[in-house]
Amino acid sequence: MRTENTATLNLIWGALILEELARLGVQHVCMAPGSRSTPLTLAAAQQTKLQRHLHFDERGLGFMALGLAKASRAPVAIITTSGTAVANLYPAIVEAWLTHVPLIVLSGDRPPELLGCGANQAIVQPGIFANYATQVNLPTPDAHIAPQALLTTVDEAVANQTRPVHINCMYREPLYPSELSGVILDAESPYLKPLQTWLQLARPYTQYGKSKQLSSPSDDAIMRFVHGKGVIVVGTLTPEQDPQQLIALSQKIGWPLLTDAQSQLRQHPAAIGNIDQLLQHPKARNLLQEADRVLVFGGRLLSKRVIGYLAEQNWHSYWQVLPEQDRLDPSHNAKHIWHANAEQFAALNWYRSSSANWANTLITYNDELHNLFVRNIDQGEFGEAQVIRAIANTRPLEQQLFIGNSLPVRLYDMYAPVSCCTATTYTNRGASGIDGLLATACGIAAHEGKPTSLIIGDLSQLHDLNSLAIAKGLSSPLVIVILNNDGGNIFNLLPVPNEQVRSEYYRLSHGLEFGYAAAMFNLPYNQVDNLADFQDSYNEALDFQGASIIEVNVSQNQASDQIAALNLWVKQS
């Protein structure tokens, strides 16, 4: 076999990796500029099966990939150069690992002889993501290593993977070929001779069967489980699990459906969406305490009240349904975990409960809260909850929501309106950081071009200001709604010892507005301080083919004061 020169062989290895990833279901590749990753970059530039996305900031790049993977329900590749470029992906990789989102990091690296000797931009990259990624360390490209070995290495690491994989790619110089031929994977190349059949086909070199096994209870177990007073709690579910099937399940069994903000069912009229607030409603809480059976779909519940309810009840039977093997119960209840998605589990042979409709009064209490929120939020003072309810009520079938962490997602969970339907809803609630939220929303918006709304706090937006560059490149509607309450005002809800400490060390008031940031990236911008102006700006932004910013200015105490007042009313109901 003729020995390929270094630059050409580097490029062939890069092309083999990207071609195999495309065959394994990857649709998008996110790339940051850098020299050591040149073989991967040049291969990606000529790969026609992948959509390419570029950004200069690797932290934002990782979160954009996270959003693309969430929206496409497929793995996304990320290409970076060596050094701290790789380290900047860490927050996104952590979030992806915790929420089972498949990201594939392809990091360029120095060869072994340039590590630990003071060579430029060289750090120890294998294992950099610790327990948050499956690690694959490739040697420097070598003509004595069969190309089949490279393909089977990629296949074994990526096939059926639901979490991040880090493939570290060492390259020796020269990195740049003297010229780029039209076809990198040339069938005439002696090195590729063993892959002649693979080159003519479109399937992966190794085809793995699906490894997921559905676990489900027997008919007899189901009959015994539903014999009593029970509740169905729906936590975080992804849209592809078809959560709508849980409405029919709830009605068939005759148990109430208690829905989290991330359930895709929070606003459904047949669900008890106001469960967080109902748990401080005396009559509703007393009724819910009669339940002795619980069926939980998903995990990562947002409401501390719901988590507390699940922890405090003396459950006769506790079932949890998860699509992956996970431990998602901070209260450590004794339970039976079934491995299935929501749609599969709802399709089992369910029976009517012997105590069907035992909690129908919850519907009345839920409706009472709905009316309370209409009067005191929708028809009350302009504020954060009012804006969130207005967004949730606007064109839910036409758009998708990404709700930021800290206060926005909690306000949605507490006060989202009941409506005909719920927009497809995304969050980053694995590690629940405030970093990368705009970049994630950009990835979600970029996948299929569906109008997308991001609800984000001011500190979260400041944290991800660089990602306005990604937003600038979008050609589909992305409405960035910034709730600017001048600092981290979720700390108003927490028992910080005194107001001075809260202000100086937690809230971090900044006095900044976002108009100049919008101008810097040439994005349409509106600043509003009343509901009518917000609704006009919001509807206009949903029809704009690109990203735009609406800044909502409210006082530091508006949301916390309103929450306190509503809590008082609910407790006195």
Curated annotation (Swiss-Prot):
One Pfam family this sequence matches: TPP_enzyme_M_2
Presence of the UniProt keyword Magnesium in the record: yes
Cofactor comment text: Binds 1 thiamine pyrophosphate per subunit.
Reactions the enzyme catalyzes: isochorismate + 2-oxoglutarate + H(+) = 5-enolpyruvoyl-6-hydroxy-2-succinyl-cyclohex-3-ene-1-carboxylate + CO2
Magnesium as UniProt keyword: yes
Domain of life, source organism: Bacteria
Name of the featured protein: 2-succinyl-5-enolpyruvyl-6-hydroxy-3-cyclohexene-1-carboxylate synthase
Species: Shewanella baltica (strain OS155 / ATCC BAA-1091)
Lineage of producing organism: Bacteria, Pseudomonadati, Pseudomonadota, Gammaproteobacteria, Alteromonadales
Gene this chain is encoded by: menD
